Design a protein with these regions (language model features):
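Mature catalytic core of soluble alpha/beta enzymes
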Residues: 2-12, 16-346, 351
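Cytosolic catalytic cores of cyclic-nucleotide second-messenger enzymes
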Residues: 354
Length: 354
């Protein structure tokens, strides 16, 4: 009897093993390339290239990714209200009045911004909303007027008065209560240097958690790669030519001097050609140097390649406001970060490579 049981057990185990081998050897479905474009988040164009087993899977993934982007866009908005949403605009409206209870996605973004303030010596300062708001208003006025002759600039006195309300220490975060309070009633937050990049990073991580294994997500100047292509090759990123927006550098003699190959990396670019207005024939762009309160004048563009889109977004802005030597020192202190700056006179030569 014992021998019979042993033989039956062995046969059963063999059957189970055979079944598991058959299941394990089942070929993977071939992944197909799909693309989609969104126009309704972060005031820019979002394009996604992804490889999925079916169009149904792709559509499900993209619907979730799109909804995530919309949510982050609404949370980080400083200009618009949304039904049932407490956002950065709400925080600004309550400056000097009362703490505002906020979503965890705001708290974590603000914490990153404070860390980057320390890391960059204040070159990233989301508390500069009062100064950036002045530049925004002048740029908006210029965009509404077809004649450049009527465009004007803020005065130094106007900017310096606003700069008295940019102390990052007046940003009070209570993580336990999940509240944010601006103790200076004249202070306001502007998260343009961190919000989009951080949102892209979080959205891509969420997509990976849902099973997306191969994708390239582009949100304006923020590019984030998820995994590799199905054949194991890396994604290739491009950098917009600051002097010809229709041209994108991707070849071996481009910005980085070699193909910008990406796998689970972020490629972010900031430039003086993205948002600007013209006064007396001179461009005044949107990246404001905290030291001068005027548009930074070191470069035409800065590109950063690193594993985190939120950090890359912050670093492009910070490096844009630093002289070359200072920027090199910062980049060399960071693991896994590559950066390059470029100007009209020295295109692609003032690199900050590690």
């Amino acid at each position: 009897m014992k021998s019979r049981i042993t033989r039956m057990t062995a046969a059963l185990l063999a059957a189970v093993l055979s079944l598991s081998l058959l299941v394990g050897c089942k070929p993977k479905k071939e992944l197909t390339r799909y693309t989609t474009i969104f126009y309704d988040v972060f005031d820019t164009v979002t394009q996604v290239i992804a490889y999925c087993e079916s169009e149904e899977e792709f559509n499900t993934q993209m619907q979730a990714l799109h909804q995530d982007l919309i949510a982050y866009n609404q949370l980080y908005d400083i200009y618009n209200d949304y039904d049932g949403v407490v956002n950065v605009k709400t925080i600004n409206e309550n400056a000097g009045k009362a703490p505002v209870q906020v979503d965890d996605r705001i708290l974590s973004m603000l914490e990153l911004a404070r860390q980057m303030y320390e890391l960059t010596g204040g070159k990233i300062n989301i508390a500069m909303g009062s100064v950036l708001g002045i530049w925004h208003d002048y740029r908006e006025a210029a965009e509404k007027d077809a004649s450049e002759a009527d465009n004007t600039l803020p005065t130094q006195e106007e900017l310096e008065a606003a700069a008295q309300h940019c102390d990052i220490n007046d940003l009070v975060i209570d993580e336990k209560a999940k509240t944010v309070y601006l103790s200076d009633p004249e202070m306001s937050l502007d998260v343009g240097s961190v919000g989009k990049g951080y949102a892209v990073e979080m959205v891509c991580r969420a997509a990976e958690a849902r099973g997306l294994t191969s994708a390239l997500v582009s949100v304006g100047g923020n590019l984030r790669a998820i995994g590799t292509k199905p054949d194991g090759s890396q994604w290739t990123g491009g950098v917009e030519n600051p002097w010809n927006a229709s041209e994108v550098y991707t070849n071996t003699n481009s910005i980085f001097g070699s193909p910008i190959n990406m796998s689970d990396l972020a490629l972010v670019t900031s430039g003086d050609y993205q948002r600007y207005f013209v006064v007396d024939g001179k461009r005044y762009h949107h990246i404001i140097d905290p030291d001068t309160l005027w548009p930074a004048a070191y470069y035409n563009g800065v590109t950063v390649l690193c594993p985190d889109s939120g950090m890359a977004d912050c670093l492009t802005t910070a490096l844009f406001c630093m002289p070359l030597e200072e920027g090199q020192k910062l980049v060399e202190s960071l693991d896994g970060v590559e950066a390059v700056s470029y100007t009209h006179l020295r295109a692609h030569e003032t690199s900050l490579h590690l």
